[in-house]
């Protein structure tokens, strides 16, 4: 666990902190809160805000009490703004959403703007308008899913230039493990493949907080092979003074903590990173 005054050079985390499947491994049998999660990981995706909108004030206050100073939340802009309104006329709603997170402003990682699969080149002016008025003290990252942003043509060039001009990161969604053989019929794999877009991986850091969402498989060897190229890239970004965010998933996320630890240990073979804290659940198991 990091001392509260130390800022990580790389933030490692998962898609959530509350998952009962992690009891007995990441968490003790009756644990599973943010405070225990933050003993190990230094960031988390905030998917709850994508589906539920701005969190309540007492909820944010509780998160603020439980998360150490080095921790970073990567909340998602609500789907009501990105998918229902498609960033049109959302200025006051964006302001209200960011204001709801005010107690956590010193612990915000990139707020993720996840755009719909059909949000393409013609709608980039709306994204430009959003980023033009984005508060400079709150990091931001954009995840696109439209196929025309993955062909290295006019649309992708325009997108990347837009993000660079606003010093906003482009989310890199790595689904190679998920869609690689073996293509078995495991229900978790099938469900994850339905939910995640199958897009090429374009590795590009457009700002100072490159954000990688690594979607693993059940096959550890496959995960190792797919993660191997990330090691050199993450090392390079850190040496350039950037602070990468690595968010690790597995198909049903049951094995995500173990995969995240495995990836981090491989990075530690190449960089003098801070040690990852022991899993509270494993620590308690050893006591017994």
Per-region residue spans from a language model:
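Residues lining hydrophobic/aromatic ligand-binding pockets adjacent to catalytic sites
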Residues: 1-288
């Amino acid at each position: 666990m990091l001392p509260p005054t130390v800022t990580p050079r790389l933030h490692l985390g998962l898609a959530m902190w509350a998952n009962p499947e992690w009891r007995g491994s990441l968490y003790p049998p009756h644990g599973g809160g943010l405070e225990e999660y933050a003993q190990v990981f230094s960031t988390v995706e905030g998917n709850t805000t994508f589906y539920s909108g701005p969190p309540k004030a007492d909820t944010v206050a509780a998160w603020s009490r439980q998360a150490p100073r080095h921790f970073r939340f990567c909340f998602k802009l609500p789907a009501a703004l990105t998918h229902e309104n498609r960033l049109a006329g959302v200025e006051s709603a964006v302001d209200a959403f960011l204001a709801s997170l005010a107690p956590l402003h010193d612990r915000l990682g990139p707020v993720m703007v996840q755009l719909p699969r059909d949000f393409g080149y013609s709608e980039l002016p709306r994204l430009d308008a959003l980023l033009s008025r984005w508060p400079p003290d709150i990091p931001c990252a954009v995840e696109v899913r439209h196929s025309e942003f993955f062909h290295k043509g006019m649309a992708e060039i325009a997108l990347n230039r837009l993000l660079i001009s606003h010093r906003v990161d482009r989310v890199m969604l790595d689904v190679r493990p998920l869609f690689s053989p073996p293509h078995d019929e495991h229900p978790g794999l099938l469900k994850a493949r339905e939910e995640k877009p199958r897009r090429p991986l374009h590795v590009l850091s457009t700002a100072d907080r490159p954000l990688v969402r690594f979607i693993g498989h059940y096959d550890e060897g496959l995960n190792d092979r797919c993660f191997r190229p990330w090691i050199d890239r993450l090392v390079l970004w850190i040496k350039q003074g950037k602070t990468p965010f690595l968010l690790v998933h597995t198909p049903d996320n049951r094995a995500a903590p173990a995969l995240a630890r495995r990836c981090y240990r491989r990075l530690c073979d190449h960089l003098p990173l801070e040690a990852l804290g022991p899993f509270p659940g494993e620590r308690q198991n050893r006591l017994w």
